[in-house]
Regions:
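Short polar catalytic/cofactor-binding loops
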Residues: 7-13
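C-terminal beta-strand edge segments of enzyme domains
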Residues: 107, 129, 200-256
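Cys-nucleophile CN-hydrolase/nitrilase-fold catalytic domain and related Cys-dependent amidase chemistry
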Residues: 14, 23-100, 170-193
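Structural motif
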Residues: 34-35, 137, 161
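Conserved beta-strand and immediately adjacent loop positions that scaffold enzyme active sites
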Residues: 80, 94, 126, 208-209
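Extreme N-terminal starter segment of soluble prokaryotic enzymes
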Residues: 1-4
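CN hydrolase (nitrilase-like) catalytic-core segments centered on the catalytic cysteine
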Residues: 64-78, 146-227
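Active-site catalytic loop in hydrolytic enzyme cores
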Residues: 86-157, 172-182, 238-255
Length: 256
């Protein structure tokens, strides 16, 4: 299955963000992508780095998500969209998945909150797992990558792929990028699971937009705006993958 992501520099202007999103959807449709993934808060901008939380109203979010739903329906491409989301009087840092008919089929709310996120959002409780064309896909967002427990839940659910929207940017911190890339490699290898990360380009990306295989190797990456297209399959497990899976299951049984 062709799965793509489209990194760009989001900001406070939702119409401008939607312009970039439309470009991504057009490119994905032309390349035959089944699912197109965008970064953390791609629709609204990530507060307070790319915009201010006070400027992200519930009405704007509803308008933007309706536009994204329409894009999915018109293009026939499923879309995973990072956004601020209002629900039940609470505000979340979320990723929503719309199918090719524009229907919401999955929602994940960021669970690991600290600093700005803890001030602006409510922690989520959803598992963020859906299946598309036989491939089981989980979602985790940005700071979640620091917590192995959140990914072990995907292992337990036998997820084939984890999509990770980020807005982790800085002026220029190559050491931080190496550390966070290491986290992604480890989360992929220890859970025998592919990972597709997509990060904002509003500043220096401290996390690569990249596709990691089940052994933690980077298969593809992109550090400028445009489409990163991946042919995601569920390969036969090699000797090392089998060993990690068997032992992880053994340790899980001991925990319970």
């Amino acid at each position: 299955m062709k799965i793509a992501c489209y990194p760009f520099a989001a900001g406070a202007d939702m119409e401008e963000n939607l312009r970039h999103i439309r470009l991504g959807v057009k490119a994905a449709a032309e390349q035959g992508a089944r699912l197109l993934c965008f970064q953390e808060c791609a629709l609204t901008g990530y507060p307070p780095v790319e915009t201010e939380i006070e400027s992200i109203t519930e009405e704007k979010c509803v308008f933007g998500l309706r536009a994204v739903s329409a894009l999915a329906r018109e293009s026939g491409v499923c879309i995973l969209m990072g956004t601020v989301l209002y629900d039940g009087g609470r505000r979340y840092n979320s990723a929503l998945v719309f199918d090719e008919k524009g229907r919401e089929i999955c929602r994940y709310d960021k669970r690991a909150l600290w600093g700005w996120d803890a001030e602006n959002f409510t922690p989520g409780e959803r598992d963020g797992i859906f299946t598309l064309d036989g491939i089981k896909i989980g979602i985790r967002i940005c700071f979640d990558v620091r917590f192995p427990e959140l990914f072990r839940a995907l292992f337990d659910a036998q997820a084939d792929l984890c999509v990770m929207p980020f807005c982790d940017t800085a002026e220029h911190l190559p050491e931080r990028r190496r550390i966070l890339t290491g986290h992604l490699r480890t989360r992929a290898a220890e859970n025998v699971m592919q990972i597709l990360s997509v990060n904002s380009l509003s500043r220096y990306p401290a996390v690569p937009t990249a596709w990691f295989d089940q052994n933690g190797r980077i298969r593809k990456q992109r550090n400028k705006e445009g489409l990163l297209l991946c042919e995601v399959t569920v390969p036969e497990e090699d000797f090392g993958m089998q060993g990690r899976r068997v032992n992880a299951e053994l340790f899980r049984e001991k925990r319970t």
